[in-house]
């Protein structure tokens, strides 16, 4: 009976509570970021992308996932390595695939209670991609990681006004 209760609670699970992933994700070309401000609490309070355009990323059903590990630095504070995996649901777009394979990007991701930014200091660069016509509907996945040879990223949140301005411009 306990098994049935668990299945029932999984079916009735409220996906909007923030434990199941991100509700919105935007990808920004690192080169489009003209300036940003991070306050003492490690919150991004300003982000200027000039005429750059943020792109919406599908975040449902593992379409966007993040992992973070600590990079131990000798003679400098430890920092984080961000690794972001994105599923591209568009199958036939050579221009998009080539841009992603050569990109240097930043991601802003919204959960129900907070918003995070990944790759703000150094950008995230492609480290892997996978396209298999026989698996997962033939979709492609791309993995972006903090570059080697840099200190790493801080754990940063994003102020609501910054989040709103970026997501209002998403295409």
Where are these regions (language model features)?
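Extended hydrophobic/Leu-rich segments
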Residues: 33-36, 44, 86, 163-170
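Mixed-charge, glycine-accented linear interaction segment located at domain edges/termini
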Residues: 120-171
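Generic detector of leucine side chains in alpha-helical contexts
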Residues: 4, 47, 95-96, 100, ...
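Short, hydrophobic/proline-enriched secondary-structure or compact coil segments at domain edges
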Residues: 20-31, 84-88, 104-112
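Solvent-exposed edge beta-strands and adjacent loop segments
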Residues: 2-81, 124-135
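Short, acidic/charged, Gly/Pro-enriched secondary-structure junctions
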Residues: 92-118
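Oligomerization/assembly interface segments of phage tail-like spikes and tubes
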Residues: 68-93, 136-151
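Intrinsically disordered, low-complexity segments enriched in small/polar residues
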Residues: 11, 53, 87, 116-120, ...
């Amino acid at each position: 009976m306990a098994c049935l209760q668990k299945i029932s609670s999984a079916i009735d699970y409220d996906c909007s509570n923030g434990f199941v992933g991100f509700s919105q994700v935007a990808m920004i070309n690192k080169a489009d970021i003209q300036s940003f401000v991070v306050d003492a609490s490690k919150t991004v309070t300003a982000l200027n992308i000039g005429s750059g355009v943020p792109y919406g990323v599908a975040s449902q059903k593992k379409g966007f996932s993040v992992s973070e590990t600590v990079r131990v630095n000798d003679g400098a504070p430890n920092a984080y390595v961000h690794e972001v995996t994105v599923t591209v649901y568009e199958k036939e777009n050579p221009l998009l695939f080539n841009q992603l394979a050569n990109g240097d990007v930043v991601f802003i991701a919204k959960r129900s209670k907070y918003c995070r930014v990944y790759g703000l200091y150094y950008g995230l660069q492609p480290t892997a991609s996978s396209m298999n016509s026989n698996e997962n509907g033939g979709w492609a996945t791309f993995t972006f990681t903090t570059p080697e040879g840099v200190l790493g990223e801080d754990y940063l949140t994003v102020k609501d006004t910054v989040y709103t301005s970026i997501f209002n411009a998403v295409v």
